[in-house]
Amino acid sequence: MKKILFPVMFLAVIMASSCGKDDDPTTPPPTQNVDMTKATIERTSNNSEFKEAPETLPKQITTNTVLKTGKTYLLTDFTFVLNGATIKIEPGVTIKGSKSPNKGALIITRNGKIDAQGTAAAPIVFTSNQATPNSGDWGGLILLGNAPNNGAKDGVAGLQAVEGGVNETATGYGLHGGTKADDNSGILKYVRIEYPGIAFAVNDEINGVTFGSVGSGTTVDYVQVSYSGDDSFEWFGGTVNCKHLISYRATDDDFDTDNGFSGKIQFGLVLRDAAIADFGPSGASNGFESDNDADGTTKTPQTSAIFSNMTIVGPYANATAATTAAPYKRGAHIRRNSKISIFNSVFVGWPVGLFLDGALTEASATSNALEYKNNTIAGCPLVVAPGTATFNSQTWFSTAAFANQTLAAIADVKLTNTGYTTFDPTPATGSPLLAGADFSSAKLGGGAFTTTTYVGAAAAGDTWFKGWTKFVNK
């Protein structure tokens, strides 16, 4: 097909309507004009289709900026949103992250904000700029806020530097943490993030979406991370609540919670690929992984996130144990003094369903600070990992009042389809997930959770995971 290139000269003026995270200042940051004078339009001679070359985003965004519907943008490096500025991303925008020479990433600093409101018909897409994309092609999306965490930096309690090589000593752009539980980092809605996730160093990575001390004033709803080279979602402290999260064919963990994260998460989907796992020296691919901190201390705030209505489909759903990558471990690994709670959820096809790891975590389970109730574990050779000499984890899991159930085979749970490209996690006729949810725990009160009768992320006939999502092979 013959292509004719027409250089053009034009200017895209980007307007914005929001400012920093706190009260609107008297004088809002000026609108940023993004230079489009060197853009090129490509015309294909057979259909007169015009394609605008991607616009490269600057390394620093210091004024309110709008990314316009129908356009494509490029992250060639770390791009920081600073100085109370807001980056507004309109529905249908595509943002591509570079693979080399630098990995692109978008970082919303704790003095910046994002307003990314796609729609079911026109989601916002972050993806790789490679013709043949792969896991870990680019960095990812990082949101930093001023909510509490249990870390410390340079002797300052509650201050942390985000992982992934983002923090710069001279600027502190990667710092997060404070005392504002209701801090607002903006909005993520109907957003796909494809092929992100890089290991900057051992235990120092950028995930699909990284939340650093993000507050409960932030809105996160309908977000899919696909083919992350590390975790899909990781929270370091913070209080943000999230709904309708999807982790698709991740490398490391799907939902990783650390450093005092205490948010509430409902309606989460996971589908794992038996061949894609964390093959690093200490790699362990889990559905949930949760620590209070790296050393398992008693620092506060303690990691205490609450999850409900999660469907966590592991590698055995599409493979046998013999053909599943060795790093695959547990549907949920709760360790290092974490006390997260999980309700009304289903774990399918993992080597181990649940592992409560360590005496402090077991103590939280005994005291009901950590709750695991109305959950189903299906097709896991080891349902619950053994506890210590003073804690029988299987007996605890099987407590009648907890209403947990075990199913021997993956087929017994009767999900509609667990195929990689035909994924439909709704419960089919006769599924035990159609009923059995319970929202009587005080942890599920307060209005953050939607009461359901079904267990798992989707009701029979549900479609919330369709239309704006993408379930494809690489």
Which role fits each region the language model picked out?
Residues 1-4, 20-21:
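Positively charged n-region of N-terminal signal peptides that target proteins for export
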Residues 95-96:
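Primarily the HKD phosphodiesterase
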Residues 27-69, 75-87, 100-111, 118, ...:
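Extracellular beta-rich repeat passengers
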Residues 20-23, 33:
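Low-complexity, highly charged intrinsically disordered N-terminal segments
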